[in-house]
Amino acid sequence: MAERELSVAILAAGKGTRMRSQLPKVLHKLGSLSLIERLLRTVLTLKPHRCLVVVGYEQEQVRQALREYPVEFVEQAQQLGTGHAVQQLLPVLGGFQGDLLVINGDVPLLRAETLQALVERHRQVNPEVTLLSAQVADPYGYGRVFCDAQQRVLELVEERDCTPAQRQNRRINSGVYCFHWPALAQVLPHLNRNNAQQEYYLTDAVKRVGKAIALDVADPQEIVGVNDRRQLAQAYQILQDRLKEAWMEAGVTFVDPDSSSLEETVELAPDVVIEPQTHLRGVCRIGPGTRLGPGSWIESSEIGSGCHILYSVVSHSRIGNHVWIGPYAHVRPHSQIGDHCRIGNFVETKNAQIGSHSNAAHLAYLGDAKLGSQVNIGAGTIIANYDGQQKHFTEIGDRSKTGANSVLVAPLQVGSDVTIAAGSTIPARYPLPDDCLVIARSRPVVKPGWRLGIRSSRPQEPQPMPPGSLKIYPLRLFPGQDLKQELERLARQQPLQAGFVLSAVGSLSQATLRLADQTGDHLLSERLEILALSGSLCPDGVHLHLTVADARGQTWGGHLRPGCLIYTTAEIVLADSPEYRFSRQPDPATGYLELHIQPVAGDPCWPSPPPQPQQNQQTKPEADNSRPKSLQ
């Protein structure tokens, strides 16, 4: 007897209300593919005679998404249940005499082997319908399937209609059926909506069609349906677990599988190590012994053997063997990195070809460029490839080097064995022949008296401190003493003219601080270590900031306030300058008492009158040193 033809119907007309989305449920992505695309690719491996997709809600979006697949669309104008959806096939299939596989479009994890086993079982036993069931630990929410010892279906009961005893049954209905179409076609017109949902149920057709048997799926995770975002996330986790388990069996290490992800289009060689927080997307091929991550994103790229990519992004590029990338590098599309190269921290490449044994270790932009072998790019080198209208190309020959903070304005041709001095800006199209040193920077210009011209806008100017003029006051405070009160007392008794803190260590049993942008005091009632104490001291008062750390290593800092009590000791070194006199005076700009600095001899540092403009002075024109000088 000839094998019956197989057709497939995928039910994809529903809105998916629980997804709370304008996008049809079946078009939500699970990894790189939509739910229905994943199912469709599995179904097409069965090579069905016809593949029918029932569409309804936002059907144009579904039709557009599946336009490249060999499917036929059947419209369900009103969504009146699964039975109603299959009724729409009656005029389409007509006199079809084969089997019809019916699957909901939101079951993306079915394996081809499972569907093939369902069809084969159906043809061996030859019932009117074979349904796919599963034994699960928690059947809540699913309709139950009741069978005899020969797996013949005795009854199908929806969850809401189950008695307490029936709810103990752990065999559930997956909603996947293989019907003999002529038998199904006879009962479809007789379905009714005599139920709470006022819908046509396909399960009613199963009950009416005749002999029905069940086949348990080996892995219940295959029949997980996606009805909301939570279930979408669960399905994604199952998909990831499948992929990672397969690659680990093939010799790939996932240091923390739960924190990494990849897609089916990724190809990993043995001894690849995937560090935590690393994600691979698109068509990727990774060579043996390469370590990816932690914290890296690889997209549609080919990476050779023995590479390490650390905290970096590589997109649509090709990386050679034994290449180090990162941390924090960005290899943008159309980059080609040769063998034994280094692309270091904060280096960005775009449409760049970099020859073997070349390095860009840090802080560089290499866009629209071709670098030879053994090229060294200094820190801060920028290839200025865009003129505001179009991109231009730069080529650098073998063994050439750029100094720190060099700018190469494209288009530019740099020969081999060229050294570009630090700080040079090379204009576009400037000739740089082989084996030359190029220096393209201006000579320094020194303008005496410059600070006087800006003093009025900078009211607090530091003054030179004559060597050996400081007076040093070391002191130790004892348990229970108040840190601020003792320092204020010392500033008054000495008295300190222009005091400040050189160093401070010790411990506190409690600390009182005024934190940034706060008006009240903050009390820390625990033992603390003094990390830093800084500020000024004078007879008018002290202005000190304190930083402390607790037993967990958490730090606190703010204005020193009364209530900072010594726990074991405080060892403090103060200094006083006899060359100046500090005081606290109202500042009209801030409204607070601020530091006023008065040299012992001379005018106050601030405020001071603005400088008078000098008359009849002409500036001598400077020489034009902007053009580069090449030294052959």
Swiss-Prot record:
Linker: region residues: 230-250
GO CC terms of this entry: carboxysome; cytoplasm; membrane
Keyword Thylakoid: no
Compartment(s) of residence: Cytoplasm
Co-factor note (free text): Binds 1 Mg(2+) ion per subunit.
Residues given in the record as acetyl-CoA binding sites: A379, N385, Y386, A422, R441
This protein's UniProt keywords: Acyltransferase, Cell shape, Cell wall biogenesis/degradation, Cytoplasm, Magnesium, Metal-binding, Multifunctional enzyme, Nucleotidyltransferase, Peptidoglycan synthesis, Repeat, Transferase
Cofactor names: Mg(2+)
Reaction(s) this enzyme catalyzes, per UniProt: alpha-D-glucosamine 1-phosphate + acetyl-CoA = N-acetyl-alpha-D-glucosamine 1-phosphate + CoA + H(+); N-acetyl-alpha-D-glucosamine 1-phosphate + UTP + H(+) = UDP-N-acetyl-alpha-D-glucosamine + diphosphate
Entry-linked PROSITE patterns: PPC
Residues annotated to bind Mg(2+): D106, N227
UniProt keyword Metal-binding, yes or no: yes
Pathway as given in its UniProt record: Nucleotide-sugar biosynthesis; UDP-N-acetyl-alpha-D-glucosamine biosynthesis; N-acetyl-alpha-D-glucosamine 1-phosphate from alpha-D-glucosamine 6-phosphate (route II): step 2/2; Nucleotide-sugar biosynthesis; UDP-N-acetyl-alpha-D-glucosamine biosynthesis; UDP-N-acetyl-alpha-D-glucosamine from N-acetyl-alpha-D-glucosamine 1-phosphate: step 1/1; Bacterial outer membrane biogenesis; LPS lipid A biosynthesis
Bias kind Basic and acidic residues: ranges: 621-632
Family to which this protein belongs: In the N-terminal section; belongs to the N-acetylglucosamine-1-phosphate uridyltransferase family.
Subunit-level organization: Homotrimer.
HAMAP family: GlmU
Function recorded in the entry: Catalyzes the last two sequential reactions in the de novo biosynthetic pathway for UDP-N-acetylglucosamine (UDP-GlcNAc). The C-terminal domain catalyzes the transfer of acetyl group from acetyl coenzyme A to glucosamine-1-phosphate (GlcN-1-P) to produce N-acetylglucosamine-1-phosphate (GlcNAc-1-P), which is converted into UDP-GlcNAc by the transfer of uridine 5-monophosphate (from uridine 5-triphosphate), a reaction catalyzed by the N-terminal domain.
PANTHER family: BIFUNCTIONAL PROTEIN GLMU (PTHR43584:SF3), NUCLEOTIDYL TRANSFERASE (PTHR43584)
Protein name: Bifunctional protein GlmU
Species name: Synechococcus sp. (strain JA-2-3B'a(2-13))
Lineage: Bacteria, Bacillati, Cyanobacteriota, Cyanophyceae, Synechococcales
